[in-house]
From Swiss-Prot:
Keywords: Membrane, Stress response, Transmembrane, Transmembrane helix. GO terms for cellular component: membrane. It is found in: Membrane. PANTHER family: ADIPOR/PROGESTIN RECEPTOR-RELATED, HEPTAHELICAL TRANSMEMBRANE PROTEIN 3. This is Heptahelical transmembrane protein 3. Belongs to the ADIPOR family. Residues 98-147, 206-210, 266-269, 334-344 are extracellular. It is a multi-pass membrane protein. May play a role in abiotic stress response. Residues 1-76, 169-184, 232-244, 291-312 are cytoplasmic. One of its GO terms (biological process) is response to hormone. Its main location: membrane. The keyword Ion transport does not apply. It comes from Arabidopsis thaliana (Mouse-ear cress).
């Protein structure tokens, strides 16, 4: 008598109508398809004005491969991934070049700016700094490069955490909670890192103030990360709170910036650096405004699902602000090198 072969039980195929009430911990094999907002589990419902093209609990392999497919997170992933590539390029150049760091390849293509850290050059080779910014040699001790690298690494950390979070947070509830916390930690890291280079170089003659400012922003960043570890603060309801927290951290730069102006008010080049820093602040502020208001998708729900929604615009402004801050930092390095004595 022949025994019937017992077929292996195949994983359950979950259709779009089965999502409501689904336990994300269940072992399920999900059809790789894009979902509508109303069919998502609660933890994936972040923006009700984006109606379609959601990934939901895809396999890890499919989730990784979705970086190369078209859905409502594609541009969120790539806007910051491209930004990461730009900062990685600058980091490699900064580490490899011993006498000169040229950022012409990045800034010539974006704003016609050429920035370098070199020797035996004039501070402003061209009066129009948006087209050409040069730097002077240090007539004394070599200026340390590590604060500049701290900023580059912090920016890269923020951008790659953001890209990976947008890519993988849809895989499961556990991934969702973990990666959005990682994303917020990355933002805090970038804010703290952005303080290091300008403060280190600007207060080279005032080590006590330098220590005070760097310690203060580091403590604020640590407190922000601890605060945002709360799962409740990762929910859409606290979107304004998160934006205001990050803006408050960034706004604290007003204090050391004002201090620098008081110390070096008679140096016109300081005001050039300040102009770029104002551009940085405006970029972050405008980006945060889009992030909180969820414009333009709020005005026409469903029309900006794939491209043009607020979070994508927010990402673009973050990268623009980070690049403007690079110019500020390199200008401050130039000023520090140009000085025949301590500081500027």
């Amino acid at each position: 008598m022949k025994r019937r072969r017992s077929a292996k039980k195949s994983p359950a195929m979950v259709t779009v109508t089965d999502w409501k009430g689904l336990d994300c911990g269940e072992e399920t094999r999900i059809v790789r398809r894009l979902m509508k907002f109303e069919d998502l589990p609660e933890y994936l419902k972040d923006n009700e004005f984006i109606h379609n093209h959601y990934r939901c609990q895809w396999s890890l392999k499919d989730t990784f491969l979705s970086a190369f497919s078209w859905h409502n997170e594609t541009l969120n992933i790539w806007t910051h991934l491209i930004g990461f590539g730009i900062f990685l390029w600058m980091t490699v150049v900064s580490c490899l070049e011993t006498t000169e760091i040229s950022l012409a390849g990045v800034f010539n293509g974006m704003a016609g700016v050429r920035i370098c850290l070199s020797s035996n050059q004039t501070l402003l080779h061209d009066s129009n700094v948006t087209h050409h910014i040069s730097c002077l040699t240090s007539q004394g001790e070599a200026i340390p490069k590590w604060p500049w690298l701290v900023y580059l690494v912090g920016a890269m950390g923020c951008l790659i955490c953001s890209s990976v979070s947008h890519l993988l947070a849809c895989h499961s509830k556990r991934f969702n909670v973990f990666f959005w916390r990682l994303d917020y930690a990355g933002i805090s890291l970038m804010i703290v890192a952005s303080f290091f280079a300008p403060i280190y170089y600007a207060f080279s003659c005032h080590p006590n103030f330098r220590l005070l400012y760097l310690s203060s922003i580091s403590i604020l960043g640590l407190l922000a990360i601890i605060t945002l570890l709360s799962p409740a603060l990762s929910t859409p309801r606290f979107r304004p709170f998160r934006a205001n927290l990050f803006l408050a951290m960034g706004s604290s730069a007003v204090i050391p910036a004002t201090h620098v102006l008081c110390l070096y008010w008679d140096h016109p080049n300081v005001f050039i650096a300040l102009g770029y820093e104002i551009a940085t602040a405006l970029s972050y502020f405008v980006g945060a405004t889009f992030y909180v208001s969820r414009v333009p998708e709020r005005w026409k729900p469903g029309a900006f699902d794939m491209a043009g929604h607020s979070h994508q615009i927010f990402h673009v402004f973050v990268v623009m602000g980070a690049l403007a801050h690079c110019v500020t930092t390199l200008l401050i390095i130039d000023f520090s090198r140009a000085s025949p004595s301590c500081g500027f």
